[in-house]
Amino acid sequence: MSSLRPEEARKLATAASVSPLSNCQFCGVVISSIADEQKLEFTNKYKGSCTLLCSYDSQGVVLRVVSDDDRSHVLKEYMIAADTDAAQMGRRSYAVSLDADNLVLRFASEQDQQLFRKVVENVKHLRPKSVFSQRTEESSASQYFQFYGYLSQQQNMMQDYVRTSTYQRAILGNAVDFQDKIVLDVGAGSGILSFFAVQAGAAKVYAIEASNMAQYAQQLVESNNVQHKISVIPGKIEEIELPEKVDVIISEPMGYMLYNERMLETYLHARKWLKPQGKMYPTHGDLHIAPFSDESLYSEQYNKANFWYQSAFHGVDLTTLHKEGMKEYFRQPIVDTFDIRICMAKSVRHVCDFLNDKEDDLHLISIPLEFHILQTGICHGLAFWFDVEFSGSSQNVWLSTSPTAPLTHWYQVRCLLPMPIFIKQGQTLTGRVLLEANRRQSYDVTIDLHIEGTLISSSNTLDLKNPYFRYTGAPVQAPPGTSTQSPSEQYWTQVDTQGSRNSSSMLNGGISVNGIGEGMDITHGLMHPH
């Protein structure tokens, strides 16, 4: 995590206890061991003075001891937890029991000792479980924050040109909403959105980040010389305190199928810091749902499950697990992209209003479905994608993950039915999608579909936490049977047309390239080099 400058850390801690598990560093600390508790005799544990690096951790605060002369080498690492024994000794010293060591820390100043005492007290007097902790398994949270603590993962998102450029355009295109305003960046990651807010004229940005990425965000802030504008605060928005209300909240809280990772609840929770009539970027999200037909995808998953249908695999009968194998494969949502022509009806749109919806509204999301079928075929399941809108004072900007829009790192998601249903053009397909939040920062997705006027129905429950990432980078193929004329003749007609243009071009001094294109006449450059 980021280590704030001592003066900044003191200011934040004194003003409003910005983070209950503050991140800071202390230089010039002399560390002694208690050699004899009866006589209170001390011996220096390390040669010379040390620097203490305190960093946020889900269990408390990690205390790293490094030499003042060589900070690249960690001498010792301790964990300050709620049950850590500690006590003040005079004005500049602090006694603390860490692991098997009974230590006395003598700080360079009274202010440093007071700040360290506050760090310890904040850990020892942790608030009751936050909303985030109540809804999230500890193992899931640990894995989640570890994942987003990697620079490579931040790079993956930042290099999503559609995502990053749309955010920048939405913010800079509505500079009136940011000029001289106080901004909160929720789940800031590398801090890229905070930088966009500063580019738009923000007076102050509080960048909240709970993963180790906070330390890299702080480095970027300092190297770009905007530390007077951006304050990186390590911690969860559900647990930290801000010194003031904000005018705008910015965040990128969308997951697969919009709701995965349950970051949207954190985004809505952040509204407690939003001033009346404040702005949220993005402002609302639309989840689109449509029935699709894709025999290739269905067969692919079905055939995988048939591995367990072997009765003599190296002499072992696997068939008893075939049913469970089938269930497991069809519980996986498919993350990839597709040609929208596989969709059999216009998509149903479910809206999430980030300005007004409550966190509780996202615990159980029930979406009624009614599709008027446009083409006869086999419905293999439902396809999902989302759009979000940035409603600004100057302009509205949309970020889309539709199969008709440029591809993003969210792709699209498809949920298969183990038992597909045949449906005809003109029929009505009704049903419901139920998204039930779980403590693994995801949802259990239940699909129920029924053809009106018949007894035909199909259903499935999927685990959004465990998707199958199918995207390979290959071009999206058109659905079978969509060609209305001979593709071969169409191609040769195009070549013939191109050839006619080439002939005309050659008469006008152009050069044919590979027989199908026009090149620039470079003979002049070859004969008369500069």
Swiss-Prot record:
Free-text description of this protein's post-translational modifications in UniProt: The dimethylated protein is the major form.
Keywords: Chromatin regulator, Cytoplasm, Methylation, Methyltransferase, Nucleus, S-adenosyl-L-methionine, Transcription, Transcription regulation, Transferase
Gene3D superfamilies: Hnrnp arginine n-methyltransferase1, Pleckstrin-homology domain (PH domain)/Phosphotyrosine-binding domain (PTB), Vaccinia Virus protein VP39
Tissue expression as described in the entry: Present ubiquitously (at protein level). Expressed in the imaginal disks and in larval brains, and to a much lesser degree in the polytene larval tissue such as salivary glands.
InterPro entries: Arg_MeTrfase, PH-like_dom_sf, PRMT_dom, SAM-dependent_MTases_sf
Ranges where the SAM-dependent MTase PRMT-type domain occurs: 141-450
UniProt modified residues of type Asymmetric dimethylarginine: 501
Localization (cell): Cytoplasm; Nucleus
GO biological process: chromatin remodeling; methylation; positive regulation of ecdysone receptor signaling pathway; positive regulation of transcription by RNA polymerase II; regulation of DNA-templated transcription
UniProt xrefs under CDD domains: AdoMet_MTases
Residues annotated to bind S-adenosyl-L-methionine: 154, 163, 187, 209, 238, 266
GO cellular component: cytoplasm; cytosol; histone methyltransferase complex; nucleus
The EC number(s) this enzyme carries: 2.1.1.319
Job description of the protein: Methylates (mono- and asymmetric dimethylation) the guanidino nitrogens of arginyl residues in proteins. May methylate histone H3 at 'Arg-17' and activate transcription via chromatin remodeling. Coordinates ecdysone-mediated expression of cell death genes.
Family: Belongs to the class I-like SAM-binding methyltransferase superfamily. Protein arginine N-methyltransferase family.
PANTHER family xref list: HISTONE-ARGININE METHYLTRANSFERASE CARMER-RELATED, PROTEIN ARGININE N-METHYLTRANSFERASE
Protein name as annotated: Probable histone-arginine methyltransferase CARMER
Organism, as annotated: Drosophila melanogaster
Name of the coding gene: Art4
